[in-house]
C-alpha cells in the first residue's frame, strides 16, 4: 500500500492482496514444506525458514517503523536471538535496573561466555555513559520500564551508545511502534513481545525484532531457523488480526490508563502511582515532559501503584476484591488485569506494588471496581 496512507490504514489492509477472486482477509497457511522446481523459493523450502503468515505479520510490523521485522515464537526467543547476535565479543550487557526480569535472566545466562549483565538507572545518562565506556558493551534499553514505568531519553541513550560503539536494543513492548519509534531515535533494533498489546486478546505468545540493519536481520533470522524459535502459523494469523485493531485499542487504553492514574494519585489509600506523563509528588517534572515529547500520542495501557499499608497482604487483598478487573499477569489485552507484581520469583518491584493493565472496558466501570477494591482496610 502506498506510504501516502496512514499507519492505521496500512495495518488494516496488511496481508490482503487486491486480486479479484482472492480472499479479502489474509489466509492461514499451516504448511511445513513447499513445492520447488529444483531451486527452493527464496526463504521458503522447509517450514522452519518461512511461512506466508509470518511474512504478512512481519511486513505489517516493520511498516510501523519503516524497517523490517523478524517474528519469533515468543518475546524471549526474540531476545535470545538478539543477545546471541550482538553480545559476542562484548563484556557487558548494560540494562535497566528496573526492567523486565526475563531480560535479566537471559543476560545472566551469558556469563559463561564472558558477558555479564550490568544493571543501571537508564534515566541517569552519565551513569550509562560510564558503564558503556568501561568495556565493550551492548545497551539493552527499555522505556517505559515494566513495572515501574520509568521513562528514559532514547535520543540521549542512542547518542551515548553510538559514541561508545555499543549497539542499542530497545524493548518497545509497552509503547508499541504506534506510540514510540526507537529506530528513529537511533536504536539498532526494537524488541517486542507480541503477546501483549500487538495481539491484544491474551491468546497468543509471539515476539519480534524490528531493525533497519540488514546484517543484524540476517543474523537473527539465522538464529531463529537454527534455534527453532519460529512462530506457529495460527499464532501469526491471530497476531496479524490483532494488529489491525491496535490503533483503536491502544488509543482507548492509553486514555483510560491516564484517567485511572490521575484518579489513583488522589486516592487516600494510594501512596505512589507510576505512569508516564503525569506529574507525581517527589518526581522531577522533566520526567513527564520527556514522556510527552517521546510518546506524544499516548503512554500505553500499563500502570502501577502502591497502597497503604505497605505490605504484600494489603496489596493481595485489593487484587482479590476486584469484581471486574481480572487477577492475572501479562498486559495489553482487551480485558483489564492486575496483580501484585513481586509475587513472581526474581521480580525486584516493591513488595506491595500492584501492576495494572488497562483494557477497553468503559473507564467508569473500571474506576468503580478500583474504588470498591480499595475499600479493604
Which ranges hold each PLM region?
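Conserved N-terminal alpha-helix of the aminotransferase class I/II PLP-enzyme fold
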Residues: 27-28, 33-81, 85, 102-110
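Short conserved active-site loop signatures built around small residues
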Residues: 1-29
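Short, acidic Gly/Pro/Ser/Thr-rich loop/turn segments
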Residues: 35-39, 216-217, 310-314, 345, ...
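Glycine-rich beta-alpha junction loops
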Residues: 16, 32-36, 174, 196, ...
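Short amphipathic alpha-helices in soluble, non-transmembrane regions
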Residues: 220, 315-323, 369-374
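PLP-dependent enzyme catalytic core of the Aspartate aminotransferase-like
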Residues: 107, 118, 336-377
Amino acid at each position: 500500500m502506498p506510504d501516502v496512507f496512514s499507519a492505521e490504514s496500512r495495518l488494516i489492509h496488511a496481508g490482503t492482496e487486491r486480486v479479484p477472486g482472492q480472499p479479502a482477509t489474509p489466509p492461514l497457511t499451516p504448511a511445513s514444506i513447499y513445492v520447488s522446481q529444483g531451486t527452493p523459493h527464496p526463504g521458503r523450502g522447509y517450514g522452519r525458514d518461512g511461512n506466508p503468515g509470518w511474512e504478512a505479520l512481519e511486513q505489517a510490523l516493520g511498516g510501523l517503523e519503516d524497517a523490517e521485522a523478524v517474528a519469533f515464537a515468543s518475546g524471549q526467543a526474540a531476545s535470545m536471538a538478539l543477545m546471541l547476535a550482538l553480545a559476542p565479543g562484548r563484556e557487558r550487557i548494560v540494562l535497566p535496573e528496573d526492567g523486565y526480569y526475563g531480560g535479566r535472566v537471559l543476560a545472566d545466562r551469558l556469563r559463561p561466555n564472558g558477558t555479564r549483565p550490568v544493571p543501571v538507572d537508564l534515566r541517569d545518562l552519565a551513569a550509562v555513559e560510564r558503564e558503556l565506556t568501561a568495556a565493550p558493551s551492548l545497551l539493552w534499553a527499555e522505556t517505559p520500564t515494566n513495572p515501574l514505568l520509568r521513562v528514559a531519553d532514547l535520543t540521549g541513550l542512542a547518542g551515548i551508545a553510538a559514541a561508545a560503539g555499543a549497539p542499542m536494543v530497545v524493548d518497545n513492548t509497552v509503547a508499541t511502534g504506534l506510540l514510540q519509534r526507537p529506530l528513529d531515535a537511533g536504536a539498532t533494533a526494537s524488541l517486542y513481545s507480541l503477546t501483549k498489546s500487538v495481539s491484544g486478546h491474551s491468546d497468543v505468545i509471539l515476539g519480534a525484532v524490528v531493525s533497519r540493519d540488514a546484517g543484524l536481520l540476517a543474523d537473527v533470522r539465522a538464529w531463529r531457523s537454527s534455534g527453532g524459535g519460529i512462530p506457529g502459523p495460527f499464532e501469526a494469523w491471530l497476531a496479524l488480526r490483532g494488529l489491525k485493531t491496535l490503533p483503536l485499542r491502544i488509543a482507548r487504553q492509553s486514555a483510560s490508563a491516564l484517567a485511572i492514574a490521575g484518579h489513583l494519585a488522589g486516592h487516600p489509600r494510594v501512596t505512589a502511582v507510576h505512569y508516564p506523563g503525569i506529574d507525581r509528588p517527589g518526581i522531577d517534572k522533566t520526567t513527564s515532559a520527556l514522556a510527552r515529547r517521546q510518546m506524544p500520542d499516548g503512554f500505553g495501557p500499563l500502570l502501577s501503584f502502591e497502597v497503604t499499608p505497605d505490605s504484600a497482604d494489603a496489596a493481595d487483598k485489593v487484587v482479590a476484591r476486584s469484581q471486574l478487573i481480572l487477577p492475572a499477569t501479562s498486559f495489553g489485552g482487551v480485558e483489564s488485569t492486575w496483580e501484585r507484581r513481586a509475587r513472581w520469583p526474581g521480580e525486584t518491584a516493591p513488595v506491595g506494588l500492584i501492576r495494572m493493565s488497562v483494557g477497553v472496558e468503559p473507564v467508569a466501570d473500571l474506576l468503580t471496581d478500583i474504588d470498591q477494591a480499595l475499600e479493604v482496610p
